[in-house]
């Protein structure tokens, strides 16, 4: 099931980031951070009252953050753009205002935009850290967005009330027959890299279309095909009409749409335009895939449009590897969606990555492996002179593969030794195209790297 997307909107300095961090900080995954992603987290999964959802810092998504020193007119324009983007892309909206500042013209302007949507809007009055401030929240009834809920994101006061109201609008977690397990591939990338052309080429190559399920104006379009007798769902993020007028540039490319596709897939095909080379946006999207712990294949498209000599392929491959060194496990495939060159290989690569994600190493074999690699390279501790021992290992889950190593003190394990173990695991067992997660647990408590 696709998690609902909840967008946080509001003026600068009203406490959006504090509220966002409080929500995300309440729930830690097995491994919170992975190497290779240095950007700020603009989104994350959380849950409340049995409802799981993805919360998004809309200002960060649209503008890479916010600058309160901008001219007032520019701040107003950006804040309004947040609201328009949220209306177009999110399933629900949390509109945060500042109880200390009181009602401002910019708040009213955003409210005018939000009242045009039928999507649920929760009005949260932040910085109400006293009884007097909470009473002042009634001023925001004037926005005609329902009952204003006082809260203090910094202290955590009232945040539960905001989430209680929000989850009234979110559907309970259910599963349908269409969600039976099979390979799901998301086609992602910047605008105009050939996502739709690739999808059309994949659909046109000796495969029968089982079903074509159109999404809403917010959802990617799913097309299920059969390939070698197995169903494969292709999730396309291109060519989807958007409701409402969005800021230029955002019209063509939606982070939320890409997030939704990545969250639902097993393997992402990240398209790179060979005529333009690797861009920062390409690596940013790869970072999304890493953070979601999904399989990844780097697809260099428009290879037919490049003038080549005997060194071109290797030089471009080196360029891609250098730019994406934080996903050095991802295969690189050079294709042309226009001519069909090597496109037929992509589904085979994706099927293999899917198999690698499901691979499980028996515990006895894993511990033989651990003894062997420790003989080659004893465990390294972060503290000089500290005594570190690794006792045994298990693989508690797949998709992605997670390896749990028990130590006398998990805090002592140096990050480079985690990398060493990952490299040795990949050398021995493959895991091509999928992240693997290394977790260290002390005998007394769990510690993660």
Curated annotation (Swiss-Prot):
One of its GO terms (molecular function) is ATP hydrolysis activity. The keyword Repeat applies. GO terms for biological process: ribosome biogenesis. CDD domains: EngA1, EngA2. Transmembrane segments: none annotated. GTPase that plays an essential role in the late steps of ribosome biogenesis. This is GTPase Der. It comes from Chloroflexus aurantiacus (strain ATCC 29366 / DSM 635 / J-10-fl).
